[in-house]
């Protein structure tokens, strides 16, 4: 078969992805990711390029969780050979955690390929992944929906006049990065000179616009989102979900006050291990009132829905000077390193095992593509949940 013949696959039908025939069990599940240390980096990229890529241990953990449910799991690198690997494997569904290989919408690359080839996949679609990566666009959508955000301005050239709506101190970061890339102690800006220097550095170093917003001095929280309106029909543990179809996770608070970058939860702070000095403090569940906890959860779900995110995400918020929470950003491909990534630690704090979390994401995705019927799961079973409240700090990394 010629190398370009993969373009001919699935030409026998013009039906949309949701009408793929239900596969015989077990499923062939391809875990698609960018492997840290093996994914090529741009020659002119920043020092923290590749920070979002996954380690071998994370990929193995996901594959093992899927295989434990009776399915066959395979790792496929998200590189230029992915189309041919998909042709050869012909998976029933893909578990996508790929960050992409550059560009303004790199996190949408793999979903776009899978949709072109009509292969089902987990989590958010092309558009939602593209929007979530572009923090400026995300904020514009949230603002249009009436959701609380900090005042902001995007700098494309660095010489634009500062908006009259913005007042020092300000906070600057790359508009299209994650994992705290481009964020350190110099991200907080107090003068016009600092603003020009920082914005110019971001544009030059990251080859993208700089997002400048009002600095939020209050507490920082991370909220996990899992589910959708009809999740209760497809989950083997319907009691996980509320009437709106979403599970309410414990709230995780990030305390960077004594971190390596005091008050700033940036890239360096996110790469530290438990044994390193300057590790931020993490409290899960956070010590918040029921009223505030409910508000944070409602905002997270609203932010998730506003950009069209699907099944799973992680939403970051910070309190302003008046003690009101404001949305910072959303991650539609949240880290899934067991015992380490925020979402995994949040889930574990209430008795949801790593295996359960991975299988919930898998089955939510499969049900969207009609790969299973409501309440027909064969051997799949969520472990019995025993929520527990953990008051001590838990050190994690995204």
Residue spans of the language-model regions?
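Short acidic/His/Gly/Ser-rich catalytic and metal-binding motifs that mark active-site loops
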Residues: 38-42, 178-181, 274-276, 337-338
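Hydrophobic beta-strand scaffold residues
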Residues: 73, 120-121, 149, 170, ...
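Active-site nucleotide/adenylate-binding loops and adjacent lid/helix of ATP-dependent enzymes
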Residues: 2-33, 83, 87-90, 129-222, ...
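ATP-dependent carboxylate activation and anion-phosphoryl transfer catalytic cores
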Residues: 2-17, 141-143, 287-398
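Short glycine-enriched, charge-decorated loop/helix-capping segments at active-site entrances
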Residues: 45-51, 184-189, 344-346
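Phosphate-binding site of ATP-dependent enzymes
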Residues: 24, 192-298, 324-326
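A short beta-strand motif that forms the metal-chelation/ATP-contact edge
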Residues: 29, 93-95, 222-227, 323-338
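ATP-binding N-terminal substructure of ATP-dependent carboxylate-amine bond-forming enzymes
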Residues: 1-121, 126-127, 132-133, 156-162, ...
């Amino acid at each position: 078969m010629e190398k370009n013949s993969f373009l001919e696959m699935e030409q026998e039908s013009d039906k949309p992805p949701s009408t793929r025939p239900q596969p015989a069990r077990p499923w062939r599940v391809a875990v698609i990711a960018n492997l840290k240390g093996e994914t090529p980096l741009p020659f002119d990229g920043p020092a923290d390029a590749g920070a979002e890529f996954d380690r071998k241990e994370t990929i193995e953990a996901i594959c093992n969780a899927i295989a434990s449910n009776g399915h066959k799991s395979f790792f496929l690198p998200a590189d230029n050979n992915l189309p041919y690997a998909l042709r050869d494997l012909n998976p029933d569904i893909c578990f996508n955690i790929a960050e992409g290989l550059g560009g303004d919408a790199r996190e949408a690359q793999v979903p776009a390929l899978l949709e072109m080839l009509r292969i089902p996949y987990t989590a958010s679609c092309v558009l939602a992944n593209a929007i979530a990566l572009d923090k400026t666009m995300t904020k514009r959508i949230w603002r249009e929906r009436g959701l609380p955000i900090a005042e902001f301005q995007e700098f494309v050239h660095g010489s634009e006049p500062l908006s009259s709506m913005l007042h020092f101190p300000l906070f600057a970061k790359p508009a299209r990065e994650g994992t705290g890339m481009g964020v350190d102690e110099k991200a907080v800006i107090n003068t016009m000179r600092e603003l020009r220097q920082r914005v110019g550095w971001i544009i030059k170093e990251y080859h993208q616009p700089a997002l400048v917003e009002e600095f939020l001095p209050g507490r920082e929280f991370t909220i996990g989102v899992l589910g959708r309106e009809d999740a209760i029909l497809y989950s083997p543990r319907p009691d996980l979900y509320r009437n709106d179809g979403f599970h309410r996770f414990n709230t995780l608070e990030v305390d960077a006050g004594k971190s390596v970058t005091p008050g700033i939860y940036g890239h360096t702070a996110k790469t530290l291990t438990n044994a390193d000095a300057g590790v931020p403090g993490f409290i899960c569940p956070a010590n918040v009132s029921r009223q505030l906890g409910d508000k944070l959860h409602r905002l997270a779900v609203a932010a998730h829905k506003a950009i069209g995110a699907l099944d799973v995400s992680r939403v970051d918020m910070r309190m302003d000077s008046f003690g009101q929470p404001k949305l910072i950003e959303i991650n539609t491909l949240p880290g899934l390193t067991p015992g380490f990534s925020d979402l995994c630690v949040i889930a574990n704090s209430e008795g949801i095992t790593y295996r359960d979390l991975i299988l919930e994401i898998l089955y939510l995705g499969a049900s969207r593509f009609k790969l299973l019927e409501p309440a027909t799961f064969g051997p799949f079973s969520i472990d019995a949940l025993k929520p527990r409240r953990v008051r001590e700090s838990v050190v994690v990394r995204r």
